[in-house]
């Protein structure tokens, strides 16, 4: 099993945070993750994206065809929709426009539901990272807005998350 998820939007919208939240939840669930961060624009508001690959086996790269696109703006769909698989899922802005800085948390919640992961693991991760009720509410709103598509089962793999820098430093 392998899934590729693109998270795209304007610089400064919390794209990396979505990837961090979802990666933490997936690792807790026993899945291997690989995150590619694209930085074409360092100017706030320019287009940025991450591709998060998920697998039940070790992985060391991303794939070009996408199973899910999280679009934090319309430009993301214009640029990346051509790479979406025919049965792929798009998580857009519908119903989330009023969330402001919690848009990314809501979209992370929506993705966790699409993946078929238990809401409690999501809420525990949100509480661990943000410590506020608004973020919890946004995550729940996102989760409740979607239907399950992939039904990931909890695995017994014991995995930790490391950045490339951490891995190099540890040898």
For each of these PLM feature ranges, what is it?
Residues 1-171:
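Active-site cofactor/cluster-binding pocket
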């Amino acid at each position: 099993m392998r899934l590729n998820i693109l998270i795209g939007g304007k610089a400064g919208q919390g794209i990396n945070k979505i990837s961090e939240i979802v990666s933490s939840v997936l690792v807790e669930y026993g899945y291997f993750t690989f995150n590619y961060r694209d930085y074409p624009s360092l100017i706030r508001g320019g287009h940025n994206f991450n591709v998060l690959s998920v697998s039940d086996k070790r992985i060391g790269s991303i794939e070009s065809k996408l199973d899910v696109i999280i679009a934090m703006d319309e430009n993301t769909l214009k640029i990346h929709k051509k790479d979406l698989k025919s049965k792929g899922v798009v998580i857009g802005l519908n119903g989330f426009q009023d969330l402001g800085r919690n848009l990314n948390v809501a979209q992370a919640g929506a993705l966790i539901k699409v993946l078929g992961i238990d809401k409690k693991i999501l809420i525990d991760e949100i509480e661990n990272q943000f410590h506020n009720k608004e973020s919890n509410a946004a995550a729940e709103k996102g989760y409740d807005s979607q239907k399950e598509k992939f039904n990931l089962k909890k695995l017994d793999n014991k995995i930790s998350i490391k950045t490339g820098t951490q891995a190099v430093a540890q040898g």
